Amino acid sequence: MKTVSQLIDMKQKQTKISMVTAYDFPSAKQVEAAGIDMILVGDSLGMTVLGYESIVQVTLADMIHHGRAVRRGAPNTFVVVDMPIGAVGISMTQDLNHALKLYQETNANAIKAEGAHITPFIEKATAIGIPVVAHLGLTPQSVGVMGYKLQGATKEAAEQLILDAKNVEQAGAVALVLEAIPNDLAEEISKHLTIPVIGIGAGKGTDGQVLVYHDMLNYGVEHKAKFVKQFADFSVGVDGLKQYDQEVKSGAFPSEEYTYKKKIMNEVNNND
């Protein structure tokens, strides 16, 4: 299992870090088998696997449930679990209680929290031994305000992002996710920080990349962002399901190959 120190060492050696967002036991098992460095259990699970209209409906209990499943599937991978909307920002005491519950009950390596405004939370969580990954740029929990659009696209916004990135590192963040920002800005931020910077829609100048399992494998998703590359096509599973339906209806399945050979009814009838 990678440690924070090893991830920082990868950055220093300019070895790119791979991260995949996964939500359950079988996907986590595949991600670990592939040798991916990190797994993010994102609150995007609300839409991707729970069918919610947005991440607003995702609860702390949801994140714990899925975080546990991912840890069971990937016991030797660095796992980061999202703090869902509403878990940070109520009061420092409640925020830390939520963070501790999530961290302890999922056995994650770190939790992730969004936004530049959570710097005090990062400081306090770090002080009590909870590693925090920060998330800047496009923060999904704020799309109701910001919308799904490129962030840091003006001089002022870019300068603010650079400042915010430095602040979350100074507060104690162990890594930073940058989403949907210009490539050159992401590269500049990565150069200025000592912690690993993982990009999603932020170009190749970051220390690593993260994509969602379902997006990159075309598994049950209808709309993919510009920055998503498809590496395999799991949608072919529909063809298998159609064939199954046809064979059940025609009687072709189950054939003798998939049937137990043991005969029992003669014995049953002989007892009558």
UniProtKB/Swiss-Prot annotation:
Chief location bin: cytoplasm
Keyword Cytoplasm (UniProt): yes
Keywords: Cytoplasm, Magnesium, Metal-binding, Pantothenate biosynthesis, Transferase
UniProt binding sites for Mg(2+): D43, D82, E114
Enzyme class: transferase
Record InterPro entries: Pantoate_hydroxy_MeTrfase (IPR003700), Pyrv/PenolPyrv_kinase-like_dom (IPR015813), Pyrv_kinase-like_dom_sf (IPR040442)
Known role: Catalyzes the reversible reaction in which hydroxymethyl group from 5,10-methylenetetrahydrofolate is transferred onto alpha-ketoisovalerate to form ketopantoate.
Database matches in HAMAP family: PanB
Name of the featured protein: 3-methyl-2-oxobutanoate hydroxymethyltransferase
